Amino acid sequence: MYNVKEDFPIFRNQKDPYIYLDSAATTHKPQCVIDAVTDYYSFSYATVNRAIYSASHDISSAYWRVRSKVAAWIGARYDQEIVFTRGTTSSLNLLAIAANDSWLAGGTVVVSEAEHHANILSWEIACRRSGATVKKVRVNDEGIIDLSHLEKLLKQGVQLVSLAHVSNVSGAVLPVQEVAFLVHRYGALLAIDGAQGVGSGPLNLSGWDVDFYAFSGHKLYAPTGIGVLYGKRELLESLPPVEGGGDMVVVYDSESSRYQEPPLRFEAGTPHIAGVLGLGAAIDYLQALPFSVSDHLTALTRFLYNRLLTIPDIQIVGPQQGTPRGCLCSIIIPGVQASDLGFLLDGKGIAVRSGHQCSQPAMARWDLGHVLRASLGVYNDQQDVISFVEALEDILRSYR
């Protein structure tokens, strides 16, 4: 049986067992990603898109090939629909600023009442400057978007809807294609915060008719500081640049500069070349695994959910049995602080997340303080889940 952990130095080099269940926050890096970054700095370092010498030409070619890999992974039609950014937050802010500087000014954006801060604050800040309005669509008790309420809001006139593909708190999965159809029926556009969706397997954004999609490389086993904003080509062409600098302008004129076509229009300055190469290596790695990433994570999430249900008094936030769930479970144990559980689990070599998960609106929606979240990555297996649940049960016995 293939041992995925052997591909990751963080697990190979531990003297004591280390169970990492916080991949919703960030994923560890396989050796091939680390090698791609260090090889670039050690043997092929040069800038991209700016010089004619061979080292620059070679690395520029490698850099652009990663756009093709990303496009294939997410199901984009064109490489030019892939804009490199610093991460999901950067992508959403880029889109919010550019849209509010053009066709969104004075209009209306809809987000859900349970979004990550990145998909609320980016819109609220940009819309406040342009005079646009942000409205919130309700979610049900499992965290699933209330489509009838969304339609009611759309009938009032909306330019853009921005929703999470997978909630980082509840794990609720957005029915993307169904939502896209509804949003487009009323003449609006759909943007997706894909931070928790991109790592669960290849996507089909063009088939789902998604207009914009944002994600971070570090949640796809790639380095930090690199992300992607996908946008349909014609929509990216409709947006103005939000940063000025090298390589995003064709002809400078103090009155009427002519800017590059997307994606370069949105990539001012020297990019995070090492991060891009690491992102390409991460996608290569995932595609070469001898099993389906999606099937593995779906089955393991189901196993985690069912094992957690065996713990007395436990409350699992979000979708219940039979409803699609992203690869995470947030839990509450009445009378026990999530931060205490996280601290005690760390003492047993188990890393989980405790807190509000950078989503205070979601905490308010379910009237929660903090939750304990276990989230899965490609390197996790059933034994990790068993060890986590047994450690949790052992800790809880001391409270009773």
UniProtKB/Swiss-Prot annotation:
Active-site positions on this chain: 358
Catalytic reactions on record: (sulfur carrier)-H + L-cysteine = (sulfur carrier)-SH + L-alanine
UniProt cross-references to PROSITE patterns, sorted A to Z: AA_TRANSFER_CLASS_5
Needed cofactors: pyridoxal 5'-phosphate
EC number: 2.8.1.7
Enzymatic class: transferase
CDD domains on file: SufS_like
Alphabetized PANTHER family for the sequence: CYSTEINE DESULFURASE (PTHR43586), CYSTEINE DESULFURASE 1, CHLOROPLASTIC (PTHR43586:SF8)
Similarity comment text for this entry: Belongs to the class-V pyridoxal-phosphate-dependent aminotransferase family. Csd subfamily.
Record protein name field: Probable cysteine desulfurase
Gene expressing this chain: csd
